[in-house]
From Swiss-Prot:
Residues reported to bind ATP: 302-309, 646-653
Family named by the database record: Belongs to the ClpA/ClpB family. ClpC subfamily.
Boundaries of every UVR domain copy: 511-546
Function in brief: May interact with a ClpP-like protease involved in degradation of denatured proteins in the chloroplast.
Gene Ontology cellular component annotations, sorted alphabetically: chloroplast
Cellular compartment(s): Plastid, Chloroplast
Organism: Solanum lycopersicum
CDD domains, sorted: AAA, RecA-like_ClpB_Hsp104-like
Region feature (Repeat 1): 97-162
The protein's name: ATP-dependent Clp protease ATP-binding subunit ClpA homolog CD4A, chloroplastic
Region listing for II, in residue ranges: 572-763
Annotated segments matching region Repeat 2: 172-236
InterPro entries, per the entry: AAA+_ATPase, ATPase_AAA_core, Clp_ATPase_C, Clp_N_dom_sf, Clp_R_dom, ClpA/B, ClpA/B_CS1, ClpA/B_CS2
Primary location group: plastid
Length: 926
């Protein structure tokens, strides 16, 4: 290898001569031209048994001047072996290429392969510039009407396709190398320390000859016009280029900042940023900190969605308007994309190199204010084993005031990351950003209204704006203003626009028919049935005309409606905002419709179809639901909280289930917690989640997670007296403030839940007092007896539960014992459930009055409520039916009558014989 290098070194003499000629002529050309571009011809001679290098070489005189040796010069170049005419470009030049410029060169090589050429010429570089697609050069060429397809055709016309062997490494032609040299010169003239796709295009235009120039000429592009457009897009005029060539620094560009940052001040000047309403105090404080001599780095700290980024945008808008003190006047706010900065840094040192370049550009400019959103990502960014992360690289500059940086992060992330690094924390001055009030949010929404109206092409009413702020504050508890209110008006606008953009039902049907006919027509053409295809085509044209007419009619109707309403397009009303809140949370906040009003007024009747008796409890629950639905309940407390006390089996849990079924949709809509599972002290943590370090910490609490997912529901704490006393302490804040903090520190909102606690405390008192309540007593005497029992039960509850717990409850309801008549009604409900199960098996069941009385007699027990009734039905009916079905006496499609004979035995009759028709009740269908 060294021998080959020695032989090849003799071929660099033309470059050496050029170097010396440049020195004698007083040229400013860099003495490193040899390093930047060489044309080496591989010598066909071979040296065998080479013993070593001589101490002196023809190049040594030149190389010593630049502090280099032949060894280092040869090592700096990358050689590619070729039979003859081997060309190469040293790596040092490509180090200055941007990623887009490197992509252009790679695409040029791909184009050469595609055309079968064993070289990369100016025409391939031109194709690469067009194909890159995103750079300045590609945009300029596209604006001139030059596309890749036409350019390829022109190239093939001029030079044709090759058919030779294509190697892995394709060399450059001398003219292509000249283009690369000229692109370097163009970059220097523009004051850039990099070579981008725009410089390659300028070099291509400056070369002026070759296939690429002919292609541009054939495509009708004016090279002078292209050059002007490129320089304009780069941000330089002809005069500025001349000034920078003359030694000025005004042409200095900041490629790293442009690549990894966004200029907020420029966006503000162009009016592309949303207006910032309020936040005057925070912007003033940020301005004060930026005016400091050292440690002039404000850090905006606040909850997610309170408007931290908006403060940086507000500062950029003030700078653009000139409404800032002279300390920061004329500066640019540039937001840095940390993800983009880290992306693609595969090798060690790449990230640090990017960051150092960025810092150098900021120091040179002295007019940059860097904004880093999510500033905690600095810590650990780019850090590999043995590497330094971004925070440690930035620390010295942040402390000395060389770098003005605005950070933004949440309270949690600030505590977790920045406070753990005191050296970084002291360099940032914290600026607290509180959540705005509802009134401030309304002002913010009114400021943003115009932008959203333009985007959605509709109009927002003042009522909708106010409803968005108020309803989001009341019902969406896990997010912060103004973010959640802005999301509400945005989604409501999207919903209304989609609703108005929908085609009429008739047009949708015609479109469906049109798709079918088009499909049939294509099949007919494939089957060469052209006569049928012609008929279908005529039908297709008719349908298209009909659909077009319907769409025009719909547009005219919408236009007339908007003109009648004096509004630009559809209108977003308060009802639309309410609908979005309901769809987000599941809480009905829309105005009560007529149907729902009737349902709420008849709620007692509805609940009584499943819960027999217990009028006091049913009325209390119905009142609470009505109060909540019309919006009269206390917004800071749950809908209601009850203790249902009474003997077992009288319908305490059943009432909660029936409420969940009839009003909340299904029994599963209820959150049921069996408090007998929380008898021990350590099990209490299951409600809110295990503490850190314990099993189940990541899963969340049984109560808190369920309520977070379904905030509008019934929460049933069954058998509350079985729970450990610590449970009651935890429930105090739920009952009073409607909130509970889980093990992860998140606040769960209970303001839209109905809390029901069942208890058997006082059942012995009810049993003793209940015996005196007979069937023949007057209503007044019944009520006085019930009131006496209620007072006794309340006293017993006070002995068992702490006063601060009982005092927070909405109501303590004592359930009565069931009478025999009520048990008979319950028997009908339970029998109906059996009928439904058999109906699913296609067996029709009827029971006689005698059998019903037998069930009630066996199942009635005042002390145990309705549960003995279920056992009686299971024993008398279900067991008898199961035996007959297994014996094959009852099959699908049979009609079965269950009766009791004179001896009191249950008889199951298949068919209608053996039982009088008047005694057999009609099957109860559900």
């Amino acid at each position: 290898m060294m021998a080959r290098a020695l032989v090849q070194s003799t071929n660099i003499l033309p470059s050496v001569a050029g170097e010396r000629a440049g020195q004698f002529n007083g040229s400013r050309k860099d003495q490193r031209t040899v390093r930047m571009l060489c044309n080496v011809k591989c010598c066909s001679s071979r040296l065998n048994n080479f013993a070593g290098l001589r101490g002196c070489n023809a190049l040594d005189t030149l190389l010593v001047k630049s502090g280099e040796t032949l060894h280092s010069k040869v090592a700096a170049a990358t050689f590619v072996r070729r039979p003859r005419g081997c060309r190469f470009v040293p790596k040092a030049m490509f180090e200055r290429f941007t990623e887009k410029a490197i992509k252009v060169i790679m695409l040029a090589q791909e184009e050469a392969r595609r055309l079968g050429h064993n070289f990369v010429g100016t025409e391939q570089i031109l194709l690469g510039l067009i194909g890159e697609g995103t750079g300045i050069a590609a945009k300029v060429l596209k604006s001139m009407g030059i596309n890749l397809k036409d350019a390829r055709v022109e190239v093939e016309k001029i030079i044709g396709r090759g058919s030779g062997f294509i190697a892995v490494e394709i060399p450059f032609t001398p003219r292509a190398k000249r283009v690369l040299e000229l692109s370097l010169e163009e970059a220097r003239q523009l004051g850039h320390n990099y070579i981008g796709s725009e410089h390659l295009l300028l070099g291509l235009l400056r070369e002026g000859e070759g296939v690429a120039a002919r292609v541009l000429e054939n495509l009708g592009a004016d090279p002078t016009n292209i050059r002007t457009q490129v320089i304009r897009m780069v941000g330089e005029s002809s005069e500025a280029v001349g000034a920078s060539v003359g030694g000025g620094t005004s042409g200095l560009k900041m490629p790293t900042l442009e690549e990894y940052g966004t200029n907020l001040t420029k966006l503000a000047e162009e009016g592309k940023l949303d207006p910032v309403v309020g936040r005057q105090a925070q912007i003033e404080r940020v301005t004060q900190i930026l005016g400091r001599r050292t440690k002039n780095n404000p850090c905006l700290i606040g909850e997610p969605g309170v408007g931290k980024t908006a403060i940086a945008e507000g500062l950029a808008q003030r700078i653009a308007n000139g409404d800032v003190p002279e300390t920061i006047e004329g500066k640019k706010v540039i937001t840095l994309d940390m993800g983009l900065l880290v992306a693609g840094t595969k090798y060690r040192g790449e990230f640090e190199e990017r960051l150092k370049k960025l810092m150098e550009e900021i120091k040179q400019s002295d007019e940059i204010i860097l904004f880093i959103d999510e500033v905690h990502t600095l810590i650990g960014a780019g850090a590999a084993e043995g590497a330094i992360d971004a925070a440690n690289i930035l620390k010295p500059a942040l402390a000395r005031g060389e770098l003005q940086c605005i950070g933004a992060t949440t309270l949690d992330e600030y505590r977790k990351h920045i406070e753990k690094d005191p050296a970084l924390e002291r360099r940032f001055q914290p600026v607290k950003v509180p959540e705005p009030s509802v009134d401030e949010t309304i002002q913010i929404l009114k400021g943003l209204r115009e932008r959203y109206e333009i985007h959605h092409k509709l109009h927002y009413t003042d009522e909708a704006i106010e409803a968005a702020a108020k309803l989001s504050h009341q019902y969406i508890s896990d997010r912060f203003l103004p973010d959640k209110a802005i999301d509400l008006i945005d989604e409501a606008g999207s919903r209304v626009r989609l609703r108005h953009a929908q085609l009429p039902e008739e047009a949708r049907e015609l479109e469906k028919e049109l798709r079918q006919i088009t499909k049939e027509k294509n099949e007919a053409v494939r089957g060469q049935d052209f006569e049928k295809a012609g008929e279908l085509r005529d039908r297709e044209m008719d349908l298209k005309a009909q659909i077009s007419a319907l769409i025009d009619k719909n547009k005219e109707k919408s236009k007339a409606e908007s003109e009648a309403g004096d509004a630009a397009g559809p209108i977003v009303t308060e009802a639309d905002i309410q609908h979005i809140v309901s769809s987000w949370t599941g809480i009905p906040v829309e105005k009560v419709s007529t149907d729902e009003s009737d349902r709420l007024l008849k709620m007692e009747e509805t609940l009584h179809t499943r819960v027999i008796g217990q009028d006091e409890a049913v009325k209390a629950i119905s009142r609470a639901i009505r109060r909540a639905r019309v919006g009269l309940k206390n917004p800071n407390r749950p809908i209601a909280s009850f203790i249902f006390s009474g003997p077992t089996g009288v319908g305490k849990s059943e009432l909660a289930k029936s409420l969940a079924t009839y009003y909340f949709g299904s029994e599963e809509a209820m959150i049921r917690l069996d408090m007998s599972e929380f008898m021990e002290r350590h099990t209490v943590s299951k409600l809110i989640g295990s503490p850190p370090g314990y099993v189940g910490y990541t899963e969340g609490g049984q109560l808190t997670e369920a309520v977070r997912r379904r905030p509008y529901t019934v929460v049933l704490f069954d058998e509350i007296e079985k729970a450990h006393p610590d449970v009651f302490n935890m429930m105090l804040q739920i009952l009073e403030d409607g909130r509970l903090t889980d093990s992860k520190g998140r606040t769960v909102d209970f303001k839209n839940t109905l809390l029901i606690m069942t208890s058997n405390v006082g059942s012995s008192v009810i049993e003793k007092g209940g015996r005196r309540i007979g069937f023949d007593l007057d209503f007044d005497e019944k009520d006085s007896s019930y009131n006496r029992i209620k007072s006794l039960v309340t006293e017993e509850l006070k002995q068992y539960f702490r006063p601060e717990f009982l005092n927070r409850l909405s109501e303590m309801i004592v359930f009565r014992q069931l009478t025999k008549l009520e048990v008979k009604e319950i028997a009908d409900i339970m029998l109906k459930e059996v009928f439904v199960r058999l109906k699913n098996k296609e067996i029709e069941l009827q029971v006689t009055e005698r059998f019903r009385d037998r069930v009630v007699d066996e199942g009635y027990n005042p002390s145990y409520g309705a549960r003995p009734l279920r056992r009686a039905i299971m024993r008398l009916l279900e067991d008898s039916m199961a035996e007959k079905m297994l014996a094959g006496e009852i099959k699908e499609g049979d009609s079965v009558i269950v009766d009791v004979d004179s001896d009191g035995n249950v008889t199951v009759l298949n068919g209608t014989s053996g039982a009088p028709s008047d005694s057999a009740p009609e099957p109860i269908l559900v």
